[in-house]
A protein has these predicted regions:
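Non-transmembrane, aqueous-exposed alpha-helical and coiled segments at domain scale
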Residues: 1-377
Length: 377
């Protein structure tokens, strides 16, 4: 028997765990592509639904294909009554990621994927319903309102989410920001949640189980939630100078500052500059100059003191805040977007599958002598 290849490095950093045609991350120290398309081009020019089609169907849609795709998604927004009933039982103090995990799992019970031929239809249903799941729970548990999730007045997923959350039609600026944000978060190669989805898929499990496992993985603070932590940090400061003093204290105390650095990117996160542009535009549109100034100062101090760059999460915090999105819902938006990447990886794993079963290096005790229970201790 040949020896298994030893994989060094904590968390398998720097190790290849498989092949993918979906995404490249940090190939030049800064780059990000989806199926060969640069993230900057997609973020500047594409609607999120075009990106979803690219990842899930395999190509950028024609206008006719995009219209059909969006029409299909709009028609899938109505929450099943039994799912509504379940969401109404979840208390307001529940973690929103638990709501997403539970909602996905219940959907898998109500509308199971019977064969892999149904994977595209099952994914489209989740893509249409995930904004409805989080907003229905939030509005009912916090406001006592039962929203009509079958609303068809917004043709984009981002616009629909904002309409369900606030009850008001979003501005065109807000719609554009959501297209960009959802595009930036859509896919990122073998991150922890995506790899969890692929491991689950490799057992030939159903797609709802794969996505539920991915949501549970993203719930962990070392993977998801960085934009929420960044928001909690920056909103405590009322000026750029106060922010600089605060960051210097945190650095002196060796506290972790969320939203900076990345496991793969060496020079910069290309998503940061893209969402930062929108954060600035939003700050001007809503007349909130101080939070953006605080964010910029924190970015400058971290670069000066630690030579660390912002990742995608940092300026997302202020961008979401400017649009009136509660901080606790930041990570569920990530789920609404990353579903496209998770599902595309599930499809890819299924198409060329072998169960993922790595080896481990045993570090426990060697041979032990059995003792009857009365002789132990």
């Amino acid at each position: 028997m040949s020896a298994a290849k030893e994989l060094g490095g904590a968390g398998l950093r720097g190790q290849s765990a498989g092949s993918t045609a979906l995404c490249t991350v940090g190939k030049t120290g800064t780059g990000l592509t989806y199926r060969g398309y640069d993230i900057t081009d997609l973020a500047h020019h594409a609607q999120f639904e075009e990106v979803a089609h690219l990842l899930l169907v395999g190509h950028l849609p024609t206008q006719a294909e995009l219209d059909q795709y969006k029409t299909r998604l709009i028609g899938l927004r109505s929450l099943p009554e039994k799912l509504k009933q379940a969401l109404e039982l979840i208390p307001a103090e529940a973690h929103p990621m638990d709501v997403m995990r539970t909602g996905c799992s219940i959907l898998g019970n109500l509308e199971p994927e019977h064969t892999f031929a149904e994977q595209q239809a099952a994914t489209e249903r989740m893509l249409a319903l995930f904004p409805a799941i989080i907003c229905y729970w939030y509005r009912f548990s916090h406001d006592g309102v039962r929203i009509d999730t079958a609303d068809q007045s917004e043709d984009s997923i981002g616009g629909y989410f904002l309409k369900m959350l606030t009850g008001q039609a979003p501005s065109e600026l807000f719609r554009k920001v959501m297209h960009c944000s959802l595009t930036l978060y859509a896919e990122h190669e073998f991150n922890a949640s995506t790899f969890a989805a692929r491991v689950c898929a490799s057992t030939l499990s159903d797609i709802h189980s794969c996505v539920t496992g991915a949501i549970g993985t993203l719930r962990g603070p070392l993977h998801g939630g960085a934009n929420e932590a960044a928001m909690a940090m920056i909103e405590q400061w009322h000026s750029a100078d106060e922010a600089e003093a605060g960051i210097m204290r945190m650095l002196a105390n060796k506290e972790k500052i969320m939203g900076f650095g990345h496991a793969i990117y060496r020079e910069s996160d290309p998503r940061n500059a893209l969402i930062k542009e929108w954060s600035k535009a939003l700050s001007e549109a809503v007349g909130d100059s101080h939070l953006y100034a605080v964010s910029e100062r924190v970015e400058a101090v971290m670069k000066r003191e630690k030579d660390l760059f912002c990742n995608a999460d940092f300026f997302h915090a202020s961008a979401y805040h400017f649009m009136g999105i509660p901080t606790k819902l930041f990570t569920p938006i990530f789920v609404m977007s990353r579903l496209t990447g998770w599902a595309a990886h599930v499809y890819e794993q299924r198409a060329n599958n072998r169960i993922i079963r790595p080896s481990a290096d045993y570090v426990g005790p060697e041979h032990q002598t059995w003792l009857p229970i009365e002789q132990r201790g």
